[in-house]
């Protein structure tokens, strides 16, 4: 019955003691739940993921790793923020927050990140209000870092959304050059405007586009130094924040997304100069949205893979997931992210 299920969840998932629950359940029921075996449950039940997701993950992951991933996705996500290096340094911001008694620490991978051990109302903090801080998962920060944008360059965040990565890229460019922020959703770009005003950046150009084939896109063909494509995806790497996504997605919806991802990446690739850098990223856990999309573009010719582990090592970041970035909440405490870095062949 529902009451028993709730008590079982409180004991098994939340770790509540029998003493805490003795007012709500008989000792016999508590003992029965505590002693119940769960090691013989189907993997989809233990990992709390749909069967179709399990089947896709099993193509590249061991069952033990899938179980660890599923359990990590049930835990609340930490609060990560990015220090706006155009306005402040991480050391100074970290010292100020610690002096205020806040439980914070530097993120282990992103040199811009700070992690809160709890979830204070950071949107009312003076450092947030003056643009020194932006809420951004550490994994998302690393996507911007892999783009490696430099002062004075021509850069595009092709699927900018509300602009978290746009702002990180703009800070890397020290508010110089030109940074296009494309998106098909007017509401998302509207959310970027107040964040952009706080950031102090003057090199960002938000532009609403109808699709990846918009004339605003095509006119930049062959002109850009770097392009980030954080493609629309299933979002299965963000289940800590959006647990309903696993019920809203399906094999059919993922198949539709892969067609869109391939089309967007192909259009974005045309914007690069010879020697330009292209970063393809998702917050998906599925190879068909990740490696398969990258390999399809490479098969068309004209792009080579730049190993992510080498880029991270050059930036003295202690993280090695191979030649492509694969972040997991079970291993890295970030959302699930994928990224590949491609370089356009010289003319």
List where the protein language model places each region.
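Class I Rossmann-like S-adenosyl-L-methionine
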Residues: 1-124
């Amino acid at each position: 019955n529902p009451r028993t299920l709730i008590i079982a969840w409180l004991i098994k998932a939340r770790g509540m003691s029998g003493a805490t629950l003795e007012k709500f359940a008989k000792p016999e029921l508590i003992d029965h739940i505590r002693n119940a075996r769960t090691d013989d449950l189907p993997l989809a039940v233990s990992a709390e993921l749909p069967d179709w997701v399990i089947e896709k993950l099993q193509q590249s992951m061991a069952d033990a790793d899938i179980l660890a991933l599923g359990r990590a996705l049930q835990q609340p996500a930490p609060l990560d923020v990015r220090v706006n290096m155009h306005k402040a340094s991480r050391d100074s911001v970290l010292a100020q927050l610690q002096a205020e008694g806040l439980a914070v620490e530097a993120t282990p991978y992103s040199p811009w990140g700070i992690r809160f051990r709890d979830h204070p109302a950071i949107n009312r903090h003076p450092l947030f209000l003056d643009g020194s801080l932006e809420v951004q998962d550490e994994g998302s920060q690393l996507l911007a870092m892999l783009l490696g944008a430099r002062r004075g360059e021509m850069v595009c965040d092709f699927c900018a959304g509300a602009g978290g990565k746009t702002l990180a890229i703009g800070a890397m460019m020290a508010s110089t050059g030109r940074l296009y922020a494309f998106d098909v959703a007017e509401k998302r770009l509207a959310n970027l405007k107040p964040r952009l005003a706080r950031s102090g950046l003057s090199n960002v150009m938000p532009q609403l586009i109808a699709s990846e084939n918009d004339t605003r896109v095509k006119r930049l063909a062959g002109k850009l130094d770097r392009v980030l494509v954080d493609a629309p995806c299933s979002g299965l790497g963000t289940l800590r924040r959006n647990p309903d996504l696993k019920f809203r997605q399906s094999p059919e919806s993922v198949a539709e997304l892969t067609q869109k991802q391939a089309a967007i990446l192909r259009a974005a690739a045309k914007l690069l100069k010879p020697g330009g850098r292209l970063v393809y990223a998702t917050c998906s856990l599925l190879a068909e949205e990740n490696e398969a999309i990258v390999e399809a573009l490479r098969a068309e010719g004209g792009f080579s893979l730049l190993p992510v582990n080498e880029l991270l090592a050059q930036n003295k970041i202690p993280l090695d997931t191979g030649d492509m970035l694969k972040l997991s909440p079970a291993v890295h405490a970030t959302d699930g992210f994928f990224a590949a870095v491609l370089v356009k062949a010289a003319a």
